[in-house]
């Protein structure tokens, strides 16, 4: 089954179940009359938003897409608020429960949008065995999951580039999903003032959304901006092996066979692996990889996805993890997918200081 079909099925299940859940909350907990009409209206709006954007990229359709994203946020927030209201038994103390239930959404939505829009810099330090003197005390940047498309566009990308360039990193590693997967005009990426600058290069590995846009298109867009795309490939830079593997969604493959047999990888040399998802950690550690950079999880982005991610990725859904000489950094990403909102997560890039162990 192709990535587009999988994406469609997951989105359809989420939309239908989410709207059904909101209907049950509104109809039987908040006792809102004719609530099903509101649900049907927004369901049609949300379902049509992606189709409209695929048909034509214009201001009106982007606005509809944005509103549908906010509506998805309202659905997720409704589950969060319902749990709070229900377990605190607030229905016994509040008159006009439905009014206050949805009034509470306003400050939450504002907070969530700011958490998504304002990109923080998370700073960490990684000690690597036998790190070449050249890289000792050098700073690199890890970015991922910007999801440029209908919502996050030119101004947001410009802000990200300025924030990265301000850090004056020696190298920048982007672990996939710079694009949202929808076809759009990205000609503005060729503006020189918006190019990411790093003395030792900017490197990219494909994410699952990159397959929907097409690896050829991604290569053309990024190549024109001096970004090196590593598709199951490796290069060595001043004694440091830099490996980029395709997303597991993009292509199922054996990691050991790919790294050991196809590439000139040496476990005796220090290495950085770019892999979109934080998966196959035990296998990667056994290969002697020093630092794996991943994203994809968005740090959960919104409740209850943060709890689901912790289960799916066995706790390796966000942050820096260390086991022996192996390090894993999972970033929550610089952008969002679906709702342009974040709850219990932040948009970020990661500044990593490399030190010799």
Where are these regions (language model features)?
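Non-catalytic terminal accessory segments
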Residues: 1-119
């Amino acid at each position: 089954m192709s990535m587009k079909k999988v994406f469609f099925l997951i989105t359809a299940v989420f939309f239908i179940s989410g709207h059904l859940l909101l209907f049950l909350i509104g109809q039987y907990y908040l006792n809102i009359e004719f609530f099903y009409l509101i649900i049907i209206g927004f369901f049609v709006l949300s379902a049509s938003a992606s189709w409209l954007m695929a048909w034509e990229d214009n201001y009106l359709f982007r606005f509809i897409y944005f509103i549908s994203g906010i509506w998805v946020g309202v659905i997720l927030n409704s589950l969060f608020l319902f749990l709070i209201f229900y377990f605190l038994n607030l229905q016994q103390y509040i008159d006009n429960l439905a009014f206050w239930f949805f009034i509470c959404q306003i400050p939450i939505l504002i907070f969530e949008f700011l958490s998504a829009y304002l990109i923080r810099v998370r700073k960490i330090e990684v000690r690597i065995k036998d790190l070449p003197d050249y890289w000792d005390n050098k700073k690199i940047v890890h970015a991922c999951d910007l999801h440029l498309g209908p919502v996050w566009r030119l101004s947001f990308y410009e802000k990200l580039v300025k924030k990265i360039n301000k850090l004056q990193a020696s190298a920048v590693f982007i672990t996939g999903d710079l694009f949202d997967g929808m076809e759009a005009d990205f000609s503005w990426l060729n503006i020189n003032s918006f190019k990411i600058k790093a003395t030792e290069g900017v490197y990219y590995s494909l994410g699952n959304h990159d397959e929907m846009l097409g690896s050829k298109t991604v290569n053309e867009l990024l190549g024109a901006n001096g970004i090196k795309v590593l598709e199951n490939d490796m290069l060595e830079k001043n004694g440091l092996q830099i490996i980029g593997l395709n997303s597991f969604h993009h292509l199922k493959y054996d990691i050991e066979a790919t790294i050991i047999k196809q590439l000139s990888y040496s476990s005796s040399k220090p290495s950085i692996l770019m892999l979109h998802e934080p998966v196959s950690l035990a296998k990667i550690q056994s290969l002697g990889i020093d630092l794996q950079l991943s994203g994809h999880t968005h740090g959960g982005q919104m409740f209850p996805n943060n709890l689901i991610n912790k289960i799916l990725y066995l706790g390796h859904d966000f942050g820096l993890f260390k086991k022996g000489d192996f390090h894993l950094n999972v970033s929550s990403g610089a952008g969002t997918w679906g709702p342009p909102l974040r709850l219990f997560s932040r948009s970020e890039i990661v500044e990593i200081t490399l030190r010799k162990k």
